[in-house]
Amino acid sequence: MRTFLYARVSVDDLTTQNQVEAVKRAGYEVKPSRVIEETISGATPAMDRPQFVKLVDKLEEGDCLVVTKIDRLGRDNIDVQKTVTMLLDMGVKLICLDLPVKDLSSAEGKLI
């Protein structure tokens, strides 16, 4: 299973390094080539973000995608729901570190 990290910040003066470090501390090993970093507003729909689209194109069934917070996927609840559903339908294991049930692809996670 390949593990990817999607790290997003909204403004140029912020860094994604804290997200990369949080994922490492949580025990996930992500190769540098699988860390997708993007500086773009969370209000921008996920599939309108160039780096996120490239990430989705790379993902295959059985891959794992880690985000530190659900808002890294977006700020609009409907868009986040669509994005989560799309990833799960692709067979991607989706991990969100700040949720009580971290694995959104699990039976419990799908209830969140």
Where on the chain are the PLM-derived regions?
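Short, structured surface patches at the beginning of a domain
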Residues: M1-I112
